[in-house]
Curated annotation (Swiss-Prot):
Role noted for this protein: SASP are bound to spore DNA. They are double-stranded DNA-binding proteins that cause DNA to change to an a-like conformation. They protect the DNA backbone from chemical and enzymatic cleavage and are thus involved in dormant spore's high resistance to UV light.
Similarity field: Belongs to the alpha/beta-type SASP family.
Keyword annotations: DNA-binding, Sporulation
Biological process, per Gene Ontology: DNA topological change; sporulation resulting in formation of a cellular spore
Remaining remarks: SASP are degraded in the first minutes of spore germination and provide amino acids for both new protein synthesis and metabolism.
InterPro entries from the UniProt entry: SASP_alpha/beta-type (IPR001448), SASP_alpha/beta-type_CS (IPR018126), SASP_DNA-binding (IPR050847), SASP_sf_alpha/beta (IPR038300)
Entries under PANTHER family matching the protein: SMALL, ACID-SOLUBLE SPORE PROTEIN A (PTHR36107:SF1)
Taxonomic lineage of the native organism: Bacteria, Bacillati, Bacillota, Bacilli, Bacillales
Organism: Halobacillus halophilus (strain ATCC 35676 / DSM 2266 / JCM 20832 / KCTC 3685 / LMG 17431 / NBRC 102448 / NCIMB 2269) (Sporosarcina halophila)
Leader sequence segment: none
Record's protein name: Small, acid-soluble spore protein 1
Any one GO molecular-function label of the UniProt entry: double-stranded DNA binding
Amino acid sequence: MANNNSSNELVVPGVQQALDQMKYEIAQEFGVQLGADSTSRANGSVGGEITKRLVQMAEQQFGGQQYGQQQK
């Protein structure tokens, strides 16, 4: 039987509100009006920026160490 874990499932309770806030802040910075009437390019630019910022936050949290390496 297939494992029904969605890759979009949030693993931290309550994080959806923070992600939504980040999305709307970035959209405002980029001058993008989110919604069905926006182009996929405009909406995608917001999603791409969210990804960049989340990766940057994770890198800072790990102190720049590469994934899989033990901190010495």
